Amino acid sequence: MRTVTTLFAAACLLAGLSGEYAFAQPAKPKTLQLKDLPASVQKTVQETLKGGAIKSIAKEKEDGIEQYEIESTLNGNSRDFNVAADGRLLVVEEATTLEAIPAAAKAAIQRKVAGGTVTTVETFAKPGKPLLYETAYKDAQGKRHEVLVDADGKDVKD
């Protein structure tokens, strides 16, 4: 009888711990379909896609703003954008290359990266704002960094 009681207690303890562990995990964003979005958001997404294909849609809250992050491809290149819950386009990030950006921006990025390896280069466009250039890179120690500059090569805070 003591063995049964001990086994029962151990099972309850493990069940309780596994439940606690499950609740402690961060929630994964739910992947959505275009049809799941409010009509105003659907309209902005369709206009912004420009014939591209949606890879994924996730709802998130960033800087206190409820928004939808749309990951897409256009002509084989990554093109991601965020749309506010009210349908406003917030930002468009599109894959590009160092060779395709203004010379001053390229030079500033190359100075920052010096000795590191560029992993991605994207245009960073917010409606009504100048176009920016965002570059992700790994330094010589393998640590990941990002740099954001304007067309003149000046550092910009997002």
Positions of the model-derived regions?
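Long, terminal "pre-/pro-" and other extracytoplasmic accessory regions
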Residues: 2-8, 12, 16-158
